[in-house]
Regions:
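Solvent-exposed strand-loop boundary residues in beta-sheet-rich modules
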Residues: 47, 106-108, 167, 214-218
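Hydrophobic alpha-helical membrane-insertion signals
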Residues: 26-68
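Accessory beta-strand-rich segments of carbohydrate-active enzymes
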Residues: 27-42, 70-173, 198-199
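Short, solvent-exposed loop/linker segments at the N-terminal edge
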Residues: 178-188
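Solvent-exposed, conformationally flexible loop/turn segments
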Residues: 71, 129-130, 185-187, 230-234
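Beta-strand-rich binding/interaction modules
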Residues: 102-104, 187-229, 235-239
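Bacterial Sec-dependent N-terminal signal peptides
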Residues: 1-27
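Residue-level detector of high-confidence beta-strand sites
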Residues: 66, 111, 222-224
């Protein structure tokens, strides 16, 4: 038999539970300062090095392997060389064990509330030529985290990370589509889309050269296309 007092206690417990959840929800920080999602894209100084594609450090690409951890904070240094002048400085982090804030030289520049997916951040306006300090600060666990997820508390951790430099007019993403065409002699066909982004403050017309290589390293197609972008514009070239 349920008494009136027991029923009231149950109702008050439910109200208290939802109040805790509401307070936790109010602590949510939305993502800001993150680049649009894209596939993994590496930068090489020359077509020859790009064809080798071994993923090692080069003139415009540096892995960040040495981090100093203090609690929920991971800190490292990176250098912006003179060769990166008038170019974009991008930071990519593969994953983290919690949502995180990005700080450059002590300044908060971005926040990512989707810690499980790779994310990129444009640090161009915040990094200076020479040595810079980069900090990834993981958020503290929510007080009602156990109510929100079945996962156990994870130790603070971050995934693979690197910084790279791209030109002011850059390839932001690469989209591919392949299919087998019986109309073309049972050949495998491919369509490639290059998402081109301009960070310039004035309209620009540029020519994009391309070379498609087969898995065996042989040239399958070459050519170029012209593209005109307005101030900080973006468009897709299809080959």
């Amino acid at each position: 038999m349920v008494t009136k007092n027991n029923l009231m206690r149950s109702i008050l417990s439910i109200i208290a539970l939802f109040s805790c959840c509401t307070l936790a929800a109010q602590e949510y920080i939305p993502t800001y300062g993150r680049e649009p999602m894209r596939g993994e894209l590496l930068v090489y100084p020359s077509a020859r090095e790009a064809a080798e594609a071994d993923g090692s450090d080069n003139k415009y690409f540096k892995h960040l392997n040495e981090w100093t951890q203090k609690g929920n904070s991971f800190t490292t240094d990176f250098t912006v060389p003179f060769a990166w002048a008038n170019r974009q400085v991008l930071f990519r982090l593969g994953w983290a064990s919690a949502d995180y804030e990005i700080r450059v030289n002590g300044e908060a520049v971005a926040y990512n509330s989707d810690c499980n997916a790779p994310a990129e951040f444009n640090l161009t306006r915040h990094a200076k030529e020479g040595r810079n300090t980069l900090e990834v600060i993981l958020s503290s666990p929510s007080k009602v985290e156990r109510l929100e997820s079945w996962k156990n508390d994870a130790s603070p951790a971050i995934g693979a990370a690197w910084v790279m430099s791209q030109p002011t007019l850059r390839i932001r993403d690469i989209l591919t589509k392949t299919w087998r065409s019986t109309e073309e002699g049972d050949n495998v066909m491919a369509e490639v889309g290059l998402v081109v982004k301009s960070e310039a403050l004035n309209p620009r017309t540029s020519r994009v050269h391309y070379e498609l290589l087969s898995p065996a390293g042989k040239t399958s197609a070459t050519g170029y296309k012209d593209i005109k972008l307005n101030m900080r514009g973006e468009d897709t070239l299809r080959f």
